Amino acid sequence: MATMTKKKLISTISQDHKIHPNHVRTVIQNFLDKMTDALVKGDRLEFRDFGVLQVVERKPKVGRNPKNAAVPIHIPARRAVKFTPGKRMKRLIETPNKHS
């Protein structure tokens, strides 16, 4: 299984659309910055057919150290990003050889 990095994404989009990689890099970085800014503010990001990104509050909990299970570890409350895939993405992942 391969990893799609930002560098590979820029290269692929640049080649597919015959756009200079620097222009693609600028647009992608701006897109990522805007997404990050929105999530930091607590906004929900919805991309139809792709999915939803939103910030959720994780409650504090007690964990265990695997090396010493007798000693509890207190994990504080925190904010985290949750991704929920859209219907189309779910369908494509469930049946990877069939594209629609």
From Swiss-Prot:
Gene Ontology MF terms in the entry: DNA binding; structural constituent of chromatin
Superkingdom as given in the UniProt entry: Bacteria
Any Gene Ontology CC annotation: cytosol
SMART domains per the UniProt record, alphabetical: BHL (SM00411)
Single GO BP term: chromosome condensation
Keywords: DNA condensation, DNA-binding
Any matching Pfam family: Bac_DNA_binding
Membership in a protein family: Belongs to the bacterial histone-like protein family.
PANTHER family: DNA-BINDING PROTEIN HU, INTEGRATION HOST FACTOR SUBUNIT ALPHA
Functional description taken from the UniProt entry: Histone-like DNA-binding protein which is capable of wrapping DNA to stabilize it, and thus to prevent its denaturation under extreme environmental conditions.
Name the record gives this protein: Probable DNA-binding protein HU
Organism (species): Chlamydia pneumoniae (Chlamydophila pneumoniae)
